[in-house]
From Swiss-Prot:
<dbReference type="InterPro" id="IPR006597">
    <property type="entry name" value="Sel1-like"/>
</dbReference>
<dbReference type="InterPro" id="IPR040239">
    <property type="entry name" value="HcpB-like"/>
</dbReference>
<feature type="signal peptide">
    <location>
        <begin position="1"/>
        <end position="25"/>
    </location>
</feature>
<feature type="disulfide bond">
    <location>
        <begin position="128"/>
        <end position="136"/>
    </location>
</feature>
<feature type="repeat" description="TPR 6">
    <location>
        <begin position="206"/>
        <end position="242"/>
    </location>
</feature>
<feature type="disulfide bond">
    <location>
        <begin position="236"/>
        <end position="244"/>
    </location>
</feature>
<feature type="disulfide bond">
    <location>
        <begin position="200"/>
        <end position="208"/>
    </location>
</feature>
<feature type="repeat" description="TPR 1">
    <location>
        <begin position="29"/>
        <end position="62"/>
    </location>
</feature>
<comment type="similarity">
    <text>Belongs to the hcp beta-lactamase family.</text>
</comment>
<dbReference type="InterPro" id="IPR019734">
    <property type="entry name" value="TPR_rpt"/>
</dbReference>
<feature type="disulfide bond">
    <location>
        <begin position="272"/>
        <end position="280"/>
    </location>
</feature>
<dbReference type="InterPro" id="IPR011990">
    <property type="entry name" value="TPR-like_helical_dom_sf"/>
</dbReference>
<feature type="repeat" description="TPR 7">
    <location>
        <begin position="244"/>
        <end position="278"/>
    </location>
</feature>
<keyword id="KW-1015">Disulfide bond</keyword>
<dbReference type="GO" id="GO:0008800">
    <property type="term" value="F:beta-lactamase activity"/>
</dbReference>
<dbReference type="GO" id="GO:0046677">
    <property type="term" value="P:response to antibiotic"/>
</dbReference>
<feature type="repeat" description="TPR 4">
    <location>
        <begin position="134"/>
        <end position="170"/>
    </location>
</feature>
């Protein structure tokens, strides 16, 4: 669940682009970030760096963050993870939530800094406190996996709940799985289904698949083939092989809709291409080439 750095930068750039306007007579820091964003989009990374440096010197947190990303990526500067960590740290000190999160990533993996799990947890925690969903999800993942700390499902539930409340789809899916299994919380299939459904609404394909399974088998709600079909369909649209396979099976059997063998076979083919072994097996049984 570690953040894709490039995607993070584009989020900031999109925000920064809203700040464009005029020449920099007053050196407004947010406007400097906007000009840096414009230069970045034009692939003038050297100029972008200058604007971000000025903004950071004026204690504009997103300017410091963007400088960190430039050093992490090596755009307009020589790649330097130590400097990336330094600028993420400045951004975090100025309460830029994703700066805290990415600094946590560096401490977790030991990139540009000495590996330090406690510091990673510290920065993920600050990101989460600043309502950055992926910071909460990263904490949840650490306590869920138990690789670098003692496994604690109760804490995992706590942090995945926060992540889900902040609309992190993956966090909602994992929260649903914890309710489903009764780990760190009493088993509650209704809450599991609600979490999977929210994940699906947030376009998390495993959430759609899991919600489909629950509606299909009547877990957490009355059995409802129509709802199951809708969730499997969305999972398949989101490139989930199991979703395509189950969607095809329901169409082949006429569950939730009129039987449609042609469409079922198309979904079996898609599921097989996406790695669903069951879909490949049924195509072999039907003597249909992928």
């Amino acid at each position: 669940m570690l953040e894709n750095v490039k995607k993070s930068l584009f989020r900031v750039l999109c925000l920064g682009a809203l700040c464009l306007g005029g020449l920099m007579a007053e050196q407004d820091p947010k406007e400097l970030v906007g000009l840096g964003a414009k230069s970045y989009k034009e692939q003038d990374f050297t100029q972008a760096k200058k604007y971000f440096e000025k903004a950071c010197d004026l204690k504009e947190n997103s300017g410091c963050f963007n400088l960190g990303v430039l050093y992490y990526q090596g755009h307009g500067v020589e790649k330097n993870l130590k400097k990336a960590a330094s600028f993420y740290s400045k951004a975090c000190d100025l309460n830029y939530s994703n700066g805290c999160h990415l600094l946590g990533n560096l401490y977790y993996s030991g990139q540009g800094v000495s590996q330090n799990t406690n510091k990673a947890l510290q920065y993920y925690s600050k990101a989460c406190d600043l309502k950055y969903a992926e910071g909460c999800a990263s904490l949840g993942g650490i306590y869920h996996d138990g690789k670098v700390v003692t496994r604690d499902f109760k804490k995992a539930v706590e942090y995945f709940t926060k992540a889900c409340d902040l609309n992190d789809g993956d966090g909602c899916t994992i929260l649903g799985s914890l309710y489903d299994a009764g780990r760190g919380t009493p088993k509650d299939l209704k809450k599991a289904l609600a979490s999977y459904d929210k994940a699906c609404d947030l376009k998390d394909s495993p959430g759609c698949f899991n919600a489909g399974n629950m509606y299909h088998h009547g877990e957490g709600a009355a059995k409802n083939f129509k709802e199951a079909l809708a969730r499997y369909s969305k999972a398949c649209e989101l490139e989930n092989g199991g979703g395509c396979f189950n969607l095809g099976a329901m169409q082949y059997n006429g569950e939730g809709a009129t039987r449609n063998e042609k469409q079922a076979i198309e979904n079996f083919k898609k599921g097989c291409k996406l790695g669903a072994k069951g879909a490949c097996d049924i195509l072999k049984q039907l003597k249909i080439k992928v």
